Amino acid sequence: MAGFAAAVFLGLMLTGCQGTQKAEQSGYKVFCRNAEATALREVQYEPEAEGGEKLVEELLSAMEGTFNRNDYQSVFPEGLTAAVSTLKDGRLTIDFNDAYKQMDDTREVLLRAAVVQTMTQITDVREVVFTVAGEALLNSENQAVGPMHASSFINSEGDSINAYQ
């Protein structure tokens, strides 16, 4: 019985550690929203670019329009565009156009979670900062959101929305 419990514990530990590894060797998981627009869904993606800003741009482009099917869709609403501002010392800054301000709260949280979780798989990216039309992204209390990490979001399976911590 103790051996079985130890095996289960080891299995859980190994499964839990998988999420912290970078995925450059075997492609990337690009996050999109489920058909109900209540949670994120992973789609495997094999980029052509190998790293740095070129890879960020390719993944952003894929997120903006590639993933529209019956069971999942892009987290980017129509009209929203994103561009890399800087990638320096592990901090990626992405600038969005003014269409960002038109999103409802649910869509905005899903977009943030999807972009951050997709980009932080890149070895060069530790954290992601959003700007809108060149200005810092502000929360509902008019405070700058600041750097976000994959761990900033609760990754829940099923029909519940992924939450921002």
Regions found by a protein language model. Name each.
Residues M1-G11, T15-Q165:
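Bimodal "functional hotspot" detector
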